[in-house]
């Protein structure tokens, strides 16, 4: 089963298959993910699914964005892969109740910068006198 997850500019693809319960991110075990808080965030779908997902191998390839965006995209892709592989609507509803972004992409992106200022909304001050 192949699923995707997106967050900001990061895109993650997860492949779920029967196995020993190993989760990899870009070929590395999830236990080696550099930031502990984000590692725990990535593992949330597996903790919620508990025994249902213990015999699934999930391989995630993630590109673009920063570490937080990649972690959120990976998390969504993993949750979708578990639901799609098990074909379990009850589990999907459980994910939605816990956190809607486990199943639905968080589509918020940074507003692009515009001319005449430092950011998307900020403008250079002008003097009237």
UniProtKB/Swiss-Prot annotation:
Record's keyword terms, sorted: Ribonucleoprotein, Ribosomal protein
One GO MF term attached to the UniProt entry: RNA binding
A single BP term in Gene Ontology: maturation of SSU-rRNA from tricistronic rRNA transcript (SSU-rRNA, 5.8S rRNA, LSU-rRNA)
Covalent S-S links between cysteines: none
Cellular component GO terms held in the UniProt record: cytosolic small ribosomal subunit
Pfam family, any one: Ribosomal_S9
Family: Belongs to the universal ribosomal protein uS9 family.
Protein name (database record): Small ribosomal subunit protein uS9
UniProt organism field: Thermoplasma acidophilum (strain ATCC 25905 / DSM 1728 / JCM 9062 / NBRC 15155 / AMRC-C165)
Gene transcribed to yield this protein: rps9
């Amino acid at each position: 089963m192949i699923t995707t997850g997106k967050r900001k500019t990061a895109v993650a693809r997860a492949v779920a298959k029967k196995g020993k319960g190993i989760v990899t991110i870009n070929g590395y075990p999830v236990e080696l993910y550099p930031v502990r808080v984000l590692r725990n965030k990535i593992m949330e779908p597996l903790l919620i699914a508990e025994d249902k997902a213990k015999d699934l191998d999930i391989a995630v390839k993630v590109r673009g964005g920063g570490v937080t965006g990649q972690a959120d995209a990976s998390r969504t892709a993993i949750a979708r892969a578990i639901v799609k592989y098990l074909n379990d609507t009850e589990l999907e509803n459980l994910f939605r109740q816990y956190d809607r972004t486990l199943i639905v992409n968080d589509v918020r992106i940074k507003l692009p910068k515009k001319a005449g200022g430092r950011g998307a909304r900020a403008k250079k001050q002008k003097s009237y006198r």
